[in-house]
């Protein structure tokens, strides 16, 4: 039987052909359900995480008032619009592990709005009474958050554009849209929707609240006060490794499962979501599908810290040195005994001692689980994905551990090696002289500083929005990172790495 194009009409045939390896949604969609969630930033992670939890609620528990309306704000989001529209907003989740692979057609995304075509439609959707939650996966740079001052980058041209009352009906940024939608709800006497960040940032809800309230105060203090008093911005920790989809993935889906999908998602079996129970206008019963909903924001912060420092910090330790050494995939780096030892020792000796204990969580078991996930060869997680937008990641995943280790007089040599590897990575040339693309919103500034500094980290460390003042004035840190930078420049990653392994 020839592979079938994914759409509503072909679902039953796809299920029959796929047998036990393929699951399809059997719940109602379209006008039969309410779209209670508007999600900005429909990428791979959203479609492997929140959309899957909602799919499970719809499939297993009959929840029909929290279907998702996806939103794309950027011109490049037209590709997702077209892919989803071509298959009735269905897509395939491919779950891969050493035990095999399974395909799950997800139907929780009910519609999609492309803001550049109709910005008013997005604002109206947010203001609709059915909308209870606006969720976000907009990456770190989408929050316009200054890491040094912890304030909104109000001087940014896009924020300035959205702050101009003349542009209220045609915003550019997430905060411009959120403000416009909330203002309309305020005028209509509705409750504010919950703004639910699903991005990989510590205190993501608190940061979102502060950025939006800061934006609103610059536009209308009355609306800002209403948001501050009535709004909800739950903090959350999210986790599921989701590599970029390749053409090989699409071909394999057609050959093995008989599904032709314009943009499937590949992911691992592991998934986790810990979220603070803070919602302004109701929420789905997330607990029914394995979400850890907690009352105490401190508990969320502890889970966040574990995940960001151990998983994401270790990803950084594999990504930047690994790409410089010429590797392509995470599992390839982990197959190298030197890297495997390095990452394990960094987690155990430098990061673990800085982390709080969480009742019911065994940190050693968590670290072992991470090693197992990193070594999964079936998801083909590419290093360039790990290395994307590092200016928003390294200040969260690596530098705080270094700062805390210095404060507590603990070891941090391996963490400095990772930071030094990123400083070399910024130059866009690996140890063999092969150029690669550096994708980062701060690329021009970073590369200019890297060229000016050479093997001296002081130029890059002068970027206060990333590093502040304390670290660049600490002698121990400067000595360690300068040594690592010089060693990498002289000997390359693979010859330098043994110096950082016991």
Swiss-Prot record:
What Pfam family is a match, any one? Mannitol_dh
Disulfide-bond pairs as recorded: none
Among InterPro entries, the record links this protein to:
6-PGluconate_DH-like_C_sf, 6PGD_dom2, Mannitol_DH, Mannitol_DH/Oxidoreductase, Mannitol_DH_C, Mannitol_DH_N, NAD(P)-bd_dom_sf
Task: Provide the GO biological process annotations.
Answer: mannitol metabolic process
Q: Any idea which GO molecular function terms this record carries? A: mannitol 2-dehydrogenase activity; mannitol dehydrogenase activity; NAD binding; NADP binding
Source domain of life is: Eukaryota
State if rRNA-binding is listed as a keyword: no
Give the Gene3D superfamilies listed for this entry.
N-(1-d-carboxylethyl)-l-norvaline Dehydrogenase, domain 2, NAD(P)-binding Rossmann-like Domain
Query: Which residues take part in binding NAD(+)?
Result: 37-48
Q: What class of enzyme is it?
A: oxidoreductase
Catalysed reaction equations from the record: D-mannitol + NAD(+) = D-fructose + NADH + H(+)
What EC number(s) does this enzyme carry? 1.1.1.67
Q: Which UniProt keywords apply?
A: NAD, NADP, Oxidoreductase
The protein's role, per its UniProt record? Catalyzes the NAD(H)-dependent interconversion of D-fructose and D-mannitol in the mannitol metabolic pathway. Has a preference for NADH over NADPH.
In the record, the note on similarity to other proteins reads:
Belongs to the mannitol dehydrogenase family.
On assembly, the entry states: Monomer.
| Name of the protein this chain belongs to | Mannitol 2-dehydrogenase
């Amino acid at each position: 039987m020839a592979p079938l194009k994914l759409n509503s009409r072909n679902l039953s045939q796809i299920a029959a052909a796929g047998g036990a390896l393929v699951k399809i949604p059997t719940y109602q969609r379209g006008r039969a359900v309410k779209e209670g969630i508007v999600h900005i930033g429909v990428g791979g992670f959203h479609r492997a995480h929140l959309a899957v939890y909602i799919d499970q609620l719809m499939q297993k528990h009959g929840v029909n008032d929290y279907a998702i309306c996806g939103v794309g704000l950027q011109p490049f989001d037209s590709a997702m619009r077209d892919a989803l529209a071509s298959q009735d907003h269905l897509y395939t989740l491919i779950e891969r592990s050493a035990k095999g692979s399974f395909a799950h057609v997800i139907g929780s995304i009910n519609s999609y709005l492309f803001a550049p075509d109709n910005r008013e439609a997005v604002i109206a959707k947010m203001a609709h009474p059915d909308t209870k939650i606006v969720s976000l996966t907009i990456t770190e740079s989408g929050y316009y958050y200054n890491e040094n001052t912890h304030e909104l980058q109000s001087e940014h041209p896009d924020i300035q554009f959205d702050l101009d009352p003349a542009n209220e009906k045609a915003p550019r940024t997430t905060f411009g849209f959120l403000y416009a939608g909330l203002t309309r709800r305020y005028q209509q006497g509705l409750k504010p929707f919950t703004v639910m960040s699903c991005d990989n940032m510590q205190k993501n809800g608190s940061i979102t609240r502060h950025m939006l309230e800061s934006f609103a105060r610059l536009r209308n203090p009355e609306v800002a006060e209403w948001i501050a008093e009535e709004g909800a911005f739950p903090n959350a920790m999210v986790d599921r490794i989701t590599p970029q989809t390749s053409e090989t993935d699409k071909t394999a889906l057609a050959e093995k499962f008989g599904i032709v999908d314009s943009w499937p998602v590949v992911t691992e079996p592991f998934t986790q979501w810990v979220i603070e129970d803070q919602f302004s206008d109701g929420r789905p019963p997330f607990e029914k599908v394995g979400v850890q909903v907690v009352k105490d924001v401190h508990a969320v912060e502890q889970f966040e810290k574990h995940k960001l420092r151990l998983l994401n910090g270790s990803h950084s330790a594999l990504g930047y040195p690994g790409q410089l050494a010429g590797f392509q995939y995470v599992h390839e780096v982990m197959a190298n005994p030197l890297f495997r030892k390095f990452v394990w020792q960094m987690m155990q000796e430098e990061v673990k001692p800085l982390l709080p204990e969480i009742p019911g969580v065994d940190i050693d078991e968590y670290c072992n689980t991470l090693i197992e996930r990193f070594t999964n060869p079936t998801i083909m997680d590419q290093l360039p994905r790990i290395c994307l937008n590092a200016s928003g990641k390294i200040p969260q995943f690596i530098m705080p551990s270094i700062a805390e280790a210095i404060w507590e007089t603990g070891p941090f040599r391996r963490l400095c090696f990772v930071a030094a590897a990123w400083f070399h990575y910024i130059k866009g040339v690996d140890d063999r002289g092969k150029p690669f693309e550096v994708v980062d919103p701060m690329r021009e500034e970073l590369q200019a500083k890297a060229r000016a500094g050479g093997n001296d980290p002081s130029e890059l460390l002068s970027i206060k929005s990333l590093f502040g003042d304390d670290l660049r004035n600490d002698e121990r840190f400067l000595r360690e990172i300068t040594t690592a930078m010089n060693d990498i420049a002289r000997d390359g990653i693979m010859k330098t790495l043994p110096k950082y392994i016991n």
